[in-house]
Amino acid sequence: IGEAAFSDCNSLESIAIPDSVTNISNHTFVSCSNLTSITIPGSVTDIGNCAFYECTNLTSITIPDSVTSIGNLAFYKCENLKDVTIPESVTDIGEYAFYGTKWLSEYPDDFVVLKNGILIAYKGKESIISIPDSVTSICNRAFAKCNSLTSVTIPDLVTSIGNSAFESCSNLTSVTIPDSVTSISYGAFQGCDNLTSVTI
């Protein structure tokens, strides 16, 4: 489905995507404010940037096992989205993909971690934290602007730290990065003005 194909279709309430579709492109359903139901088939492998941005009446989404990538802001400001199923096949989640959703705001733990070990976000206010041992990857912007954070220890299973993962954590002074980490992405610690101790 091409970019912005159904954007601003405010009367669209439901859609069933056929099995012939392999990709939901950027901005495909942006601001479809009355969309309440969508069926994504097992043929889809990628959900693009802003694909469902501000679909404010969407309440649930089941992402099939075929999907490996969810783009930046894919479900951003889907304010009534409460039930989300993300399979272990998803290995790449873009910046703020689920921000502004009930699913994220009502998530029962401070660390939002998928079954496959991807840490999407941190919602807590603690100053000293140890990331859970189950985490294998830290998502883009997972800790961005966590101004309460002063010290963080990253566990031994983590292999990658995403773009801007700790950007503008203005009070962060120390971070411990294990040998398992093979990739620290663009801007991971950008704007951490008080960072004085990094153990790698």
Where are these regions (language model features)?
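Structural signature of tandem-repeat unit edges
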Residues: 9-23, 33-46, 56-69, 78-92, ...
